[in-house]
């Protein structure tokens, strides 16, 4: 392995772990939004628990990682350079940060797949993508999983309210608040078994691409460990902006609803991880929350927020793909092009973080509103007033 390739591989691993970190704080909401919204868990306690269980979950299975490293990209038919994978990761990270900025719970998984597919098509040609695997392991689960989780949550919440109809409100709240502690932890654990593995698969694919690991092999232990730590660290940061949208924006959530939503989500994700389906945990959790909103008598679903989320889901794959393709077009020109892409990505990330400071969302104010709005800068307000 020459020096230039070694530098690019190192850059890919760092970028992959950065994506894993953004996945953690972007998707913390999946596990903890409903428990925080109902008061079952304090915000900081929730993210500490979620981070710890994401780390544990990362060690429980590698089936999804194998889908990424040896499934959707046809590394045996074409030569996949590490710079292609790097470009795909850049596409995923930029889209993750943009949707985090506006508080949209879009799919980190689909951002990753979209960025990777776009980069590989530009870098190696359309034959570099195994579209059969993309359809069977990614797109079909993306359509089916939120519906399954939503139906399960709908039935569960109907059953719960039938069983507890003679109980006092205090008994219901206290009982299901304890139950939510368990189910929220299960969702966090299941998130680790699915989402952390995607980055493991990316790093493994990179090692296979440069001949450092045999084709068809799974992730090495050090890869599992660093990916688990990265997603746990990101989760600990708390994706408060997305937590606000999921916990307050879709529907008003009671403790029985939170319990039902989390139980349905955890079951769907764990079964899918065991089968190697690289589904979107965001879509699963959103579907289950909508299911509970429809299932509770007299409750309403905010279809405006749901529509915004649906648009984000539909746009994520192609949008990340376009960014990944553009990044690959520059990165494949050589080491200088790859470094230029890295510089542009860092600048874009800094701009997004600066914009987020105009309307910060944190553990202290996460439940104070139902959506995230980006406030104009002071200079903009002055200019408008003038």
Model-derived regions, located:
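Multi-pass alpha-helical transmembrane bundle typical of ion/small-solute transporters
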Residues: 1-386
